[in-house]
Amino acid sequence: MLVVSYDIKYDKLRTKFSKMLTKNGAVRLQYSVYEINNTERVMNNLMVIIENEYVPKFDGGDSVIIFDVSAVKLKKYGNAIHRDKDIVYF
């Protein structure tokens, strides 16, 4: 599982980046923090996309931090707990 956190100054690039993460299976945890729980191939492709398409467009203050996190060692509190539970509809 990856946790992606970003700080991008320009609205257009930030929106495009956010949509790209969602398109690749990311779930928003907070405003600029996403969780990606996908196959290793998809996660590696995502990092290539970031490096090739977004990093060259970054301004001096822009940043993306990617954490490779073990789901076993992850601890969630508050609203984040409910995101992992199944929803049953009748």
Model-inferred region functions:
Residues 1-41:
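Extended, hydrophobic alpha-helical segments
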Residues 2, 13, 27-30, 50, ...:
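A general marker of short, structured functional hotspots
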Residues 8-12, 39-45, 63-65, 85-86:
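Short linear motifs at secondary-structure transitions and domain/linker junctions
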Residues 16, 44, 76:
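Short acidic, gly/pro-rich beta-turn/loop elements at beta-sheet edges
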Residues 22, 46-48, 84:
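Short, charged/polar low-complexity linear motifs in solvent-exposed/disordered segments
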Residues 29, 36-60, 73:
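Short, intrinsically disordered low-complexity segments
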Residues 55-90:
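C-terminal structural segments of small proteins and small subunits
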